Amino acid sequence: MVKSDIEIAQAAEELPITDVAAKLGLTSQDLEPYGYDKAKVNWQAIKRSEENGHLGKMILVTSISPTPAGEGKSTMTIGIGDAINNQLGKKTVIALREPSMGPVFGMKGGAAGGGYAQVIPMEDINLHFTGDMHALTSAIDNLSALVDNYIYQGNELGLDPEKIVIKRGLDVNDRTLRKVTIGQGSKFNGVERPASFQLTVGHELMAILCLSKDIADLKERIGKVLVGYTYEDEPVFVKDLGFQGAIAALLSTALKPNLVQTLEHTPAFVHGGPFANIAHGNNSILSTNLALHLSDYVLSEAGFGSDLGGQKFLDFVSTKLEKKPDAAVVVATVRALKYQAEKSTDHLKEENLDSLKEGFANLDRHMNNVRSYNIPVLVVINKFPTDTEAELDLLKSLIEEQGFPCEIVTAHDEGSKGAKAAAEKIVELADKSDYEIKRSYDLDDDLETKIEKVAKRIYHAADVEYTDKAKDQLVKLKKMGKDKLPVIIAKTQYSFTDNVKELGAPTGFTLHVKGLSLRNGAGFVVVSTGHILDMPGLPKHPAALDIDVDETGKISGLF
């Protein structure tokens, strides 16, 4: 019987976290342990690492458009990282985002890799971990409570209850909280107003946590968060209300990177978790920079496909790092590409070369998108048991015909041994890397130009269309002097368009911009397209129905 991911993880022989840290030159005095197998790295160690003058090679991992068939991007990131570390003997760190409990209990289930390429302790990482998500949720909701109390207690600045833009947050998928009314009943219950909840990982405070370099930076960014507008339509920021210190205090521990290990004991930083469809989609700047200072190779996974997390990493996140990536990996699977053509999971286990050829257009778009930044690219095929030799040969030849190196990876079943060839190739590319990055837009471009450049170059749209609401918001942002900020486009992860049903590699379409939201503390503008939601709902059969715990406390069902 094939073991499940959680069974494999629970059978693993973990090293004490102090032994894992020692591989990076960290001592027990550099750690704040959370039990035996996980720890936060303290500020003393972070500051010391910043002064060591060393920067390792940076490898970005992205993928094709996600499908119900699965791509295994985390599995590939971990498997290749393990192979560089253990098969090639080169000091390596893996940098991943923390899973959100919403999708863990919703559609996705666990998110810590798979098979014999996982980060552990898997149950902790997927559930409460070191408490970062709880700290963020507390900070988000305390901020909202303080704002509502400010209005109730006199509202000296004249903050308009109808123009509050910050939302409350929960790390739970709950569609009933997308639109609510608070303060109902008597005045004793506060000022009645419409409100909304969003998933914790999509909130601006999550973005701020992942972009802050230290506590001072964290506090300054929180102070810049836009709360809402006055009755005279003047902006009000957190610093105007004096709440930044309290909120920063709630997040001061969460800001420190979390250290864990893979099944093969490769050090891994799992820290921060902004979604790539509604936020910037990459792990924290602090953990990536720390990894670069402490190792020779760092693999960082960007959320969803190259059009979302990949694009946001290359156009925005990498400008905040101490270096640009040296190479990139694009992950693909045979069955996911067949899904791009068939739009159904019914027959994906059956050989179908015609569907694979048709679906290849999606991978072709993604790998060329990444190459358009001038970055060296390796395409890896995550092999599944149902893949036939004919399908694998066809896909590999299609990739290589486009001038991309390609390796087939079996890390899910074989661990690092199944990723050795890919590890050798990506190390070769990273070591030889010497290029000038060509980003999608210039930082000096205005918002409309940035949006148009991403839409046309990365999505291959023909045009961009704005609602009247979005046009008004553009005018307001320009009036506020915020029209030159980077853009984070909120878009469905399933398509290059804003329509979830348009699979493959569509062209000639119009991208529909519904609204623009200032994330002043994070330093970008979120551009909402299509029907993207920042508070997901649960599916008819949520993953929660498969999760259980026995009388000994052993958890099952997290894949």
Swiss-Prot record:
**Keywords of this entry:** ATP-binding, Ligase, Nucleotide-binding, One-carbon metabolism
PROSITE patterns, alphabetized: FTHFS_1 (PS00721)
User: Which reactions appear under catalytic activity for this entry?
Assistant: (6S)-5,6,7,8-tetrahydrofolate + formate + ATP = (6R)-10-formyltetrahydrofolate + ADP + phosphate
Chain positions recorded as ATP binding sites: T67, P68, A69, G70, E71, G72, K73, S74
InterPro entries in the cross-refs = Formate_THF_ligase, Formate_THF_ligase_CS, P-loop_NTPase
Indicate yes or no for the key word Nucleotide-binding.
yes
Pathway annotation from the record: One-carbon metabolism; tetrahydrofolate interconversion
What molecular function terms (GO) are annotated for this protein? ATP binding; formate-tetrahydrofolate ligase activity
Primary enzyme class: ligase
Swiss-Prot/TrEMBL GO biological process terms? tetrahydrofolate interconversion
What Gene3D superfamilies does UniProt report for this protein, alphabetically?
Domain 2, N(10)-formyltetrahydrofolate synthetase (3.30.1510.10), Formyltetrahydrofolate synthetase, domain 3 (3.10.410.10), P-loop containing nucleotide triphosphate hydrolases (3.40.50.300)
Q: In terms of domain of life, where is this protein from? A: Bacteria
EC number of this enzyme: 6.3.4.3
Write down the SUPFAM superfamilies for this protein, in alphabetical order. P-loop containing nucleoside triphosphate hydrolases
Return the NCBIfam families for the record.
PRK13505.1
The record's family statement is: Belongs to the formate--tetrahydrofolate ligase family.
What name is this protein filed under?
A: Formate--tetrahydrofolate ligase
Q: Which organism is it from?
A: Lactobacillus delbrueckii subsp. bulgaricus (strain ATCC BAA-365 / Lb-18)
